């Protein structure tokens, strides 16, 4: 498995940052690897919402698995080849917020033997997404 964690400090209030990030149709605005993201099931952000996402030439269907309004969401996509599990946590920090983006990419089945080999690529993808996230939230990347 490849694991990536980024933390962004933002002047935006927690509620605002969470509202933006929990709507996965905003993905393409901050992650340069995402070319499109459209909600295909559900009525706005929340548990069970589904999004069709085109990322790094892969068509994904993300499902929001856990949702704690204003604080945390977990969403997952699974293809024949890999499973992507992402968690966004937003907490108050002063007048702004701190956002933690935690992503895990696991190759499925026998491909799992190659997990170590994908870590550098996943780090590059994560670094680009983290930079876009910090920029979009008018924040700074702190880890």
Provide a role label for each language-model segment.
Residues 122, 126, 130, 134-141:
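Short amphipathic alpha-helical signal-transduction/dimerization elements
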Residues 1-3, 48-50, 70-72, 94-98:
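A generic structural signal for beta-strand entry/edge sites
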Residues 76-128:
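Beta-strand/loop substructures that line and gate deep hydrophobic ligand-binding cavities in soluble
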Residues 49-56, 73-79:
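Short beta-strand segments that buttress and anchor functional surface loops
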């Amino acid at each position: 498995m490849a694991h990536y964690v980024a933390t962004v400090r933002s002047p935006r209030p927690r509620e605002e940052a969470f509202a933006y990030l929990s709507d996965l149709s905003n993905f393409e605005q901050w992650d340069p690897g995402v070319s499109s993201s459209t909600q295909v099931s559900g009525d706005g952000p929340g548990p069970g919402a589904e999004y069709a996402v085109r990322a790094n030439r892969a068509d994904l269907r993300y499902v929001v698995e856990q949702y704690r309004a204003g604080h945390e969401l977990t969403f997952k996509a699974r293809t024949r080849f890999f499973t992507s599990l992402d968690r966004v946590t937003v907490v108050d920090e002063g007048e702004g917020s701190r956002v933690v983006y935690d992503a895990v990419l696991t190759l499925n089945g026998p491909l799992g033997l190659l997990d170590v080999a994908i870590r550098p690529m996943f780090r590059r993808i994560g670094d680009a997404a983290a930079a876009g996230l910090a920029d979009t939230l008018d924040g700074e990347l702190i880890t």
